[in-house]
């Protein structure tokens, strides 16, 4: 009897350390799998830069920043953002509208995003890095405890387990970018997402979907990037899309053909 009880408790403990199946489905309603872009349609430069962005490059992460400075009306310039970077001092954040800027300019904000220097236009030349979105309000946006986001992942229709620690946030309202950066890093590490076929990059198409209980879902074609360099590859985050982290989960669909 004691052995049976111990076995049951061990099973429960192991289950809680991985992402459960949460309101998932084997196919996304947002984008048909046949419409997903194939990895072979990306140029080699773009594929290499996607790998660099999501796996190797450090991210801009900070809390409780404030700035009234701008370069253009759809930007906010954070002077002295980098304190120990080899090249950059300032961070120029670009949004797709002035309305978004007005929500954050002069307010206490938190930042989490992928930044780049090559082809960054604005600020002090060679001393300013650029980033699209990645901004949330600081005040009254902190969870009482860190949120670990459950992930459902299917590879060619077969569900694979994803550790529950893979994607997490301490924010009530979080940018999709923050969650997406963490998820794609895992996909690169586990599945060589942005490797070429020669270097064991077996995944040929993919879709990531961010679901919440109260808002429309947000989805990205994992190989749907435009252009070759960070200034265009990262433009999907320019809308600074945020979602409520409560009762949310992520669905990922990967295909090897």
Swiss-Prot record:
Its cofactor is Zn(2+). GO terms for molecular function: metal ion binding; MHC class II protein binding; toxin activity. Keywords: Disulfide bond, Enterotoxin, Metal-binding, Secreted, Signal, Superantigen, Toxin, Zinc. The keyword Transmembrane helix does not apply. InterPro entries: Enterotoxin (IPR008992), Staph/Strept_toxin_CS (IPR006126), Staph_tox_OB (IPR006173), SuperAg_toxin_C (IPR016091), Superantigen_bac (IPR013307), Toxin_b-grasp_Staph/Strep (IPR006123), Toxin_bac (IPR006177). GO terms for cellular component: extracellular region. Residues 1-24 form the signal peptide. Disulfide bonds join 120-130. It is found in: Secreted. Its main location: secreted. Pfam families: Stap_Strp_tox_C, Stap_Strp_toxin. Belongs to the staphylococcal/streptococcal toxin family. Monomer. Interacts with MHC class II molecules alpha/HLA-DRB1 and beta/HLA-DRA chains. The interaction with MHC-II molecules occurs at both zinc-dependent and zinc-independent sites. Interacts with T-cell receptor beta variable 7-9/TRBV7-9. This toxin seems to be coded by a bacteriophage. This is Enterotoxin type A. It comes from Staphylococcus aureus. The gene is entA.
């Amino acid at each position: 009897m004691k052995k049976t009880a111990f076995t049951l408790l061990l099973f429960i403990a192991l289950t809680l350390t991985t992402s459960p199946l949460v309101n998932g489905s084997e196919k996304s309603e947002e984008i048909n799998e046949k419409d997903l872009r194939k990895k072979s349609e990306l140029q080699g430069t773009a594929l290499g830069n996607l790998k660099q962005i999501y796996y190797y490059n450090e991210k801009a992460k900070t809390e409780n920043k404030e700035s009234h400075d701008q370069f253009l009306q759809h930007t906010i310039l954070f002077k002295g953002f980098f304190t120990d970077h080899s090249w950059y001092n300032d961070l120029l954040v670009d949004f797709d509208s002035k309305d978004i800027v007005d929500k954050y300019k002069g307010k206490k904000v938190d930042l989490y995003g992928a930044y780049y220097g090559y082809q960054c236009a604005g600020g002090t030349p060679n001393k300013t890095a650029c980033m699209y979105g990645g901004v949330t309000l600081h005040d009254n946006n902190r969870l009482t405890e860190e949120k670990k986001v459950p992930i459902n992942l299917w590879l060619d229709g077969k569900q694979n387990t994803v550790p529950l620690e893979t994607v997490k946030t301490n924010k009530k309202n979080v940018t999709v970018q923050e969650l997406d950066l963490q998820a794609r890093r895992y996909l690169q590490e586990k599945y060589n997402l942005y490797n070429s076929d020669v270097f064991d990059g077996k995944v040929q198409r993919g879709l990531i979907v961010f679901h919440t209980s109260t808002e429309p879902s947000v989805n990205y074609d994992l190989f749907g990037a435009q252009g070759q360099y960070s200034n265009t590859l990262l433009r999907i985050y320019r809308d600074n899309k945020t979602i409520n982290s409560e009762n949310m989960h992520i669905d990922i669909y990967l295909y090897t053909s």
